[in-house]
Amino acid sequence: MLLAPHTMHQISTPIIQKTGAQAVVASLLRHSITSGFGIPSIHNIALYEALRQTPEFQHWIVRHEQAAGFAADGFYRSSGKVAVVFASTGPGNLFTLVPLLESLQTNTPVLLIGTNIASSLLASTGGALHETPEQLEIIRPLTRFARRVTSPDEINDVFAQAAEMLLGSLPGPHSLRSLMTSFLLH
């Protein structure tokens, strides 16, 4: 079920890029991607704060990540504009598998931006919140492009690669997986 469009800003001040989350939002706008669907969570809260500060980005909060995936697919089919799916770590990312498959089979461009646990916890098996081994490898077969971003410095280049394929030569779903620490680092 889709909730009403949610304008995530209170003041219209431009984002001064300081964090990985702000770099993600700036990259979306640079490639004219201005709409998205998703659920705020502990692992992507910095991203939602950056979205809140960006009045030109329209976001719809949904009740389930699968709904976000289908909404982004339908958004493109009805408007011709790419939308983003914002998914949280672990189960949230995996709930997007069915809509990603639909987008893949119909060559519908959709961009999935998912999160992962903190980089310091990746190699552990200590039971971090929403820890799911090899999330990117699970999603990779259902996307045309899948990449893990491990540093805020990589965000602009990775977005440029994804956007070139997403908006041009290789339509279909694309996935960017960002470590939680990438959103928080300067």
Question: Which residues fall in each region the model found?
Answer:
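N-terminal alpha/beta PP-like core and its mobile active-site loop of ThDP/TPP-dependent enzymes
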Residues: 2-186
